[in-house]
Amino acid sequence: MMYQNICIMIIMLPLASSIINGLFLRVIDKKLAQVIATGFLSLSALFSLIIFCDTGLDGNIIHIKLLPWIEVGTFKVNWSIYIDQLTSIMFIAVTWVSSIVHIYSLGYMAEDKGIIRFLSFLSLFTFFMLMLVSSDNFLQLFFGWEGVGVCSYLLIGFWYSKESANKAAIKAFIINRASDFAFILGVITIIVYCGSANYKDVLSSAELLSNIKIFLHFSILDIICLLLFIGCMGKSAQIGLHVWLPDAMEGPTPVSALIHAATMVTAGVFLVARCSYLFEYSPLILQFITIIGGVTCLFAASIAIMHSDIKKIIAYSTCSQLGYMFMACGVSAYNSGIFHLVTHAFFKALLFLSAGSVIHAVHEQDIFKMGDLRNKMPVTYGNFLIGSLALIGIYPLAGFYSKDSILEAAYSSGSFMFIFGIAAAILTAIYSMKIIMLVFHGKTKLEKDVFEHAHEPAKVMNNPLILLVVGSFFSGMIGYYLLAMDKPNGYFHASLFNLHIYKLLISHPPLYIKLLPMAVGIVGIVTGIYLYKSSTVMSFPQKRKSSKNIKNAWILRSSRGMTPLVLISNILRNKYYFDEIYNCLIVKPINCLASLFYLGDQQIIDRFGPNGFSRVVNCFSVLTGKIQTGYVFNYALYIVSFIVVTISYFVWKNIMY
């Protein structure tokens, strides 16, 4: 009973924080609101450790039925909390990163008048993510799924007076609604064919669903898994549905850290892992997931190379790392995917919040306009360096263990996406060093007064990052130990399912495969330092007056026109033209169609329908009003005229007949 109450508290404390700060927004004291938000989230994080020790390490499963929700005939759905090893590790990632972001926000948003509203939205965001990962059925999961989508809209567009923030929020909302349409179709299909939305009932029907062929060689399970994965692609920003993610940087930096590290974007990876029982019986969709993940990790990393906005580089890095996670799930290494999800939560939050400290100090996001900040902000420099090395996968940091686990699984599965993963690892190291060299080394490009006043942020912003540094160091070692348990899937043995135990295949990979990820990371580091150590390194602008004294002049236009390297750089700089393609193929046709409907609705239907009728009535009433002159002789004329017309009518009638 005690553990059940703790589970309820973990989820309800963020909700209570959001409700209290949201309802009493205008009357509550600012300091009290901050204490409530950070205190409640910190308690939730501490409670999650207790549940991790009980459920995760001891192998217990907690299932709490809170109250009935839907009951139609034999179809029943309850509000429930389901805690197993997978949920408990997600609780750790979500609550700890969220509580750190809440504390960091006290300093970052200190001068913002809407800080209480901001904390309310952050807490609500956390609640929906916790509800998502603790559900025991697809409908409750969809409730949390849509909840994090709505909260992301509110937080990305938090500065609603800023037009670009509003556009980014709408863009994120619409793209996620498009993918969520596929997701809800998948849930409906599950309910139709299984008669239930509960995980236990649906997952036990996986083999049966795989034998129901609907056309060609596709089973109904293939369709279900495809629809669910399309939903995951939108939420986790995979290639094709990724375009909202960099625009989400318009929100405050703590929002970026929360969205990209522990909530929302990780929901898709969690869903695939939770539904491993379904996906294992759909090998075709698993291959599709592997390809999408592998292509995304290389695709996003290549874009990050060419960006100059510090937050957008890290955003594309998130997109790339999510690709790694999906690639792991695609080769049935769900445990490796979740392992990387958790380690990534710590070092990516560290990177975002360190970037926030830089932005807070110099009020600039273009890395080519910074430089030489390592002496001004040594703690931030150290934090960013640790986060970057963890991202690259350097031993003994967390990324080394989790990324290595994914690439080993990809290699052992025989997937050619292993090559994509290795290539992405090199690019990851290059763009990580690009930020470090241009922001913290070299000659500063900042204005003199800005550079002189640059300093470390307040302790309320710096101190919480110590926990993220600890997580970036030790989460990998702990995770490696948990996965090494003498059971299939290690720590996740009761949560994940493998139709073919891939673990036997990778128990003894070649030594060079184990060392290759870190080796290519080191190559990328050296390359990044070489390319960006010069203060005259180019920023790839659209036009440049001269290429003289520029080390990387090979990328400029040749005397014969555009070189292949310039063409590639333009493609990368313009993000493979996805926005332009969508604008041409989707946005403009929809706008044209909307204009056509507007013409038909406003200019034809309304003009000759309700509006036209009202104009006729108005004209008639005006004419009628003019008859009422108030003069007796006018009324006498009307009477005489009426009598004359009446008599004339009857006389004419008699003459005719």
Swiss-Prot record:
GO biological process, one term: ATP synthesis coupled electron transport
Homology family: Belongs to the complex I subunit 5 family.
Class of enzymatic activity (EC top level): translocase
This enzyme's EC code(s): 7.1.1.-
Transmembrane segments: 5-25, 32-52, 89-109, 114-134, 138-158, 172-192, 214-234, 253-273, 285-305, 313-333, 339-359, 381-401, 416-436, 465-485, 511-531, 580-600, 632-652
Gene3D superfamilies: 1.20.5.2700
Catalytic activity reported: a quinone + NADH + 5 H(+)(in) = a quinol + NAD(+) + 4 H(+)(out)
Pfam families per record: Proton_antipo_M, Proton_antipo_N
PANTHER family: NADH-UBIQUINONE OXIDOREDUCTASE CHAIN 5
Protein role: NDH-1 shuttles electrons from NADH, via FMN and iron-sulfur (Fe-S) centers, to quinones in the respiratory chain. Couples the redox reaction to proton translocation (for every two electrons transferred, four hydrogen ions are translocated across the cytoplasmic membrane), and thus conserves the redox energy in a proton gradient.
Mode of membrane association: Multi-pass membrane protein
A molecular-function term among this protein's GO annotations: quinone binding
Primary location: membrane
Listed GO CC annotations: plasma membrane
Subcellular localization: Cell membrane
Full protein name: NADH-quinone oxidoreductase subunit L
Keywords assigned by UniProt, alphabetized: Cell membrane, Membrane, NAD, Quinone, Translocase, Transmembrane, Transmembrane helix
